[in-house]
Amino acid sequence: MTDVTIRELASLAELRDSEDLQRAVWGQDDPADNADLMLAIQHEGGLVAGAFAEDRMLAFLFAFPSALPGVQHSHRLAVLPEARGLRLGSRLKWFQRDWCLAKGITLVRWTYDPIRAINAGLNVRVLGGTSGTYLENYYGTMEGINAGLPSDRLMLDWQLDSPAVVARATGRPVPRIAETRRLPIPADIDGLLLTDPAAALTARMDLRRDLVEAFAAGERIIGFDSTAPAYHLAKSQPGG
């Protein structure tokens, strides 16, 4: 494939192209973020970026300022199915990190579905995000690829200047925490949802119970094992 360029979207036409990309990833029934709204947010300090092979957009990221100084909310990250395997999701996130740090933003937050192993692998294992906040049925009933289960989410904290994130960004060894415990999740929740919807719902509710209890007890997600999918949890450190 032609070399891929990561950059901010530069026109209303590109923003409209991102609507098509969103539908290709999440399904035609899932409402895409509107180009006009993204344009206004971009002009007010938001980030709308894409991964391009020549003039074709292969992946897309949308983030906007939060109510807290130095904190950004990252709302969308989408990669076309045929472009998966090119690490475009992680490349866009590292682009986002550089963009944020240049503007004095040191914390990025976003929600993701904790039962999707591929998302946990990117958000926690690759990027170094952590979480101690569980949001039950956050978006209500959803359509597209998110249909069929309660829309539970984790609020992920990506502390851009933390030792764990800096190590990942620079290719250095990641600091290890000695005492952790594992919490397994399904390897393929989408496949399970197709073959055994009742088992998929049970897996969702079991994970909800386990994470809500863990967070209430002062534990926090600090790692993820992609080979045998499982979260690593540890007690929150003072001030952390």
List each model region and its residues.
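Conserved acetyl-CoA binding element of GNAT-fold acetyltransferases
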Residues: 70-81, 181-188, 192-195
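Conserved catalytic-core motifs of GNAT/GCN5-like acyltransferases
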Residues: 111, 121, 128-146
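A conserved acidic, glycine/proline-rich C-terminal tail/linker
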Residues: 197-216
